[in-house]
From Swiss-Prot:
The gene is pepA. It is an enzyme of class 3 (hydrolase). Its cofactor is Mn(2+). This is Probable cytosol aminopeptidase. Mn(2+) 2 binds at residues 270, 275, 293, 354. Mn(2+) 1 binds at residues 275, 352, 354.
Amino acid sequence: MEFSVKSGSPEKQRSACIVVGVFEPRRLSPIAEQLDKISDGYISALLRRGELEGKPGQTLLLHHVPNILSERILLIGCGKERELDERQYKQVIQKTINTLNDTGSMEAVCFLTELHVKGRNNYWKVRQAVETAKETLYSFDQLKTNKSEPRRPLRKMVFNVPTRRELTSGERAIQHGLAIAAGIKAAKDLGNMPPNICNAAYLASQARQLADTYSKNVITRVIGEQQMRELGMNSYLAVGNGSQNESLMSVIEYKGNPSEDARPIVLVGKGLTFDSGGISIKPAEGMDEMKYDMCGAAAVYGVMRMVAELQLPLNVIGVLAGCENMPGGRAYRPGDVLTTMSGQTVEVLNTDAEGRLVLCDVLTYVERFEPEAVIDVATLTGACVIALGHHITGLMSNHNPLAHELIGASELAGDRAWRLPLADEFQDQLESNFADMANIGGRPGGAITAGCFLSRFTRKYNWAHLDIAGTAWRSGKAKGATGRPVALLSQFLLNRAGFNGEE
């Protein structure tokens, strides 16, 4: 699907369809008022007859409106004008895309980007429209033999901006939006792949392909079990012991900063391609969704794709910690004591608290890069789902400025995170009689004690932890990976690169 921006009058658009908003109760948006005036009150007459109230989600498709060059006008209900916020704006765009696709409009000029969204500029509105459009049209049908496609799918979308001065920022918004949307799609595709296909080797192959595509400044190295043993990554290795699939850590290095002294930002993704729970096996119900336990790695992969596509002037390293947690004769057990790469020892009380055992060794490994910051992304705890539900990602950090940056980026991207405390009081719950620490700290504050566990391996750099257990996928009828938090991390890196959308 193609996207572009232009600045023009609505009545002069020779398009299959133009899209304008209507507010509650039956109030025309400024652009719709222009069309109404030129059509001698045709649109307002329809509204007076009660054809459209302007409530969110309502639509009315008009054909051959007098004095208008476009074949059709799509009126979209936007709710009350003062209540149009970021979330409502994206829902309006989503409804627009679905309606255009369902009605066979292959191209359209969209004036919704001229609606007022409090505190958001045209760059934001165009970029969010692109990302939302791509999200709306996403489907995962690679493994289906019968693929259903619309008869006349939407192929071209033009977003109108108020003045020619804003064309440059609009074009930049489309460029950024497409790169982020492609990263989200890549993350969703990886997450939705079944575990018999998407194992650690598959993750490694995707990481290598990324380096092949962007060979100018992307290098991928894959570290296998033999090298992990030499490095002392015994905790990571223990988790994969019960699986026939080899544990593989894929390290993607992107160099975009011309300065020799520039330190990298490191992203670490938990990549449990299937988590049965191991010996502490999970209940059968819903276990199929444990293929999504690699969504942290999928998100890091998606972000690295975005960074390489936009050639951001940063150094960024993405680590995909691929592994599979299975029961078996070689599987690690409750009661085992593991010596981590850091030298600290961990008593295993539950083999289903495995993500932190993989991440702790990776967080030690990345010290060698002398990072500016490290952010790990993991479907880590069911406790985070209880705390924050399925809408907001949990954030913990040992560095206040980094935490504030991430929260700000999450708000701007519409991919929200909420900070949880890493208070010393919670550390006591990890005490063990037989090792330096236990791998679980009981039910109270489970998301926080998991963060506390990881914090013991991140003392040499600024670090943040994103627990995406509640936000990485949806269950039920809309089952599938969400691609979160690709948008959050993309915004964070765009901010770091100086692209704050204020041009």
